[in-house]
């Protein structure tokens, strides 16, 4: 039984190692793929007719590009700039806040090469960060289901009430299509959310069926391997996700409250305050099968939008439901609570690094009762190791008798052979929740901690934290009771600190800080428990001697 327990602990440790390998490969290895970018001419040549009730992303394309290339209006903010083109679309959004202007992180080998090179390693910051791709579907593009009307709309530029404006100012965009006029009224705010009203004028007051899009997802974080695609939520709070390359057919969603296109840090979205929601259509981009979102409309519309960072507090201030745009995978329900706690701690200490350390301390306190039981159990197993070895020798070749006597021994001394594994198992979901939070949180981008850590969202530039993590893990092993009787298992366990150091060396510094702090707290906790158990053992021996 003891051997089985040791095997289980070894399997868990190795499983964790392989999970780290998988994470490393998934998040940090660049896949061998090329992005297919369909030119306007290719789009025209490959055009196929589709049902007018199910508009394809390329269904309304046109080779007339002159109006699309003209800049119509510019909205300027303190930390951003938005451009509107001649088709009444958001042509580009530029962020000017310095936290988004740090240069792209180098790959591991390139970084190491520069680290040991005499050449200047610093890269100049960006002047501004564009969020949208130049050749992709633009937010606020209107498409009509009538092909003739749609073609005319794509060749007729809008007029604007203003060419330059600031936050809280109203912009009226008008497109005259002869018997029909479209009026878009826009008001942009400092937090990058906006109000949108779509109205029509026609002699017969008839409004043709049309769609409007929130646009193709931002492309400011192309090397990220977190969720990228379309995410929407309906009135029942059910969230639907369509990832890049997975849009294989047109999908319809009724009672939709918000429609968003996201990458790791940024989003472009449309939402409504009407509890009945709207009908959303998810189509596929030709060539890539990346999802494209549309809202199907038959009347005039009052909508709201946002385009910018997935900052939790900003989104919550606009509308609490928009915080669901921040996606953490299968453990979102748990990870969101972790982030809320982390954000609260940040508000308290004013530094994300110290907030991570406080979060780690809180997690250790919550898990302390189970950790204590596990450590006590491991200490008891260590003390029973000589007796267990005797039983293994005595009942060699008789596994059933050996197991029965082992269980009697455990019961007599109150030892739990699985007690040391439980804390390790419980830390797995906690670790992955914290991992997703620290990797996805745009709040950590360009966030300093101390000294050499100037950005907690990227790897430690000098690999000091990963080395400290490995050393702390080895230290933890040295103070933890060793219940292994198999020399090979013991050798494998000794290699784990080195293995984890290699896996974590390119992980975000914030995550490595959490793991290092967790190891140090585990060591301190183990030393305290060892001292407590030693005192109890001494007192027990003294009482036994007196009697």
Swiss-Prot record:
GO biological process: protein insertion into membrane; protein transport
Compositionally biased tracts (Low complexity): 37-50
Membrane-topology annotation of the record: Multi-pass membrane protein
Renumbered residue ranges of the record's region Disordered: 37-62
Keywords, ordered alphabetically: Cell inner membrane, Cell membrane, Chaperone, Membrane, Protein transport, Transmembrane, Transmembrane helix, Transport
Record-linked InterPro entries: Membr_insert_YidC (IPR019998), Membr_insert_YidC_N (IPR028053), YidC/ALB3/OXA1/COX18 (IPR001708), YidC/Oxa/ALB_C (IPR028055), YidC_ALB_C (IPR047196), YidC_periplasmic_sf (IPR038221)
Polar residues compositional bias, start-end: 51-62
GO cellular component terms, semicolon-separated: plasma membrane
Single annotated GO MF: membrane insertase activity
TM region positions: 8-28, 325-345, 348-368, 414-434, 449-469, 495-515
Entry annotated with the keyword Transmembrane helix: yes
Family of this protein: Belongs to the OXA1/ALB3/YidC family. Type 1 subfamily.
Reported function: Required for the insertion and/or proper folding and/or complex formation of integral membrane proteins into the membrane. Involved in integration of membrane proteins that insert both dependently and independently of the Sec translocase complex, as well as at least some lipoproteins. Aids folding of multispanning membrane proteins.
Subunit text: Interacts with the Sec translocase complex via SecD. Specifically interacts with transmembrane segments of nascent integral membrane proteins during membrane integration.
Protein name (Swiss-Prot/TrEMBL): Membrane protein insertase YidC
Origin species: Helicobacter pylori (strain ATCC 700392 / 26695) (Campylobacter pylori)
Gene name of this polypeptide: yidC
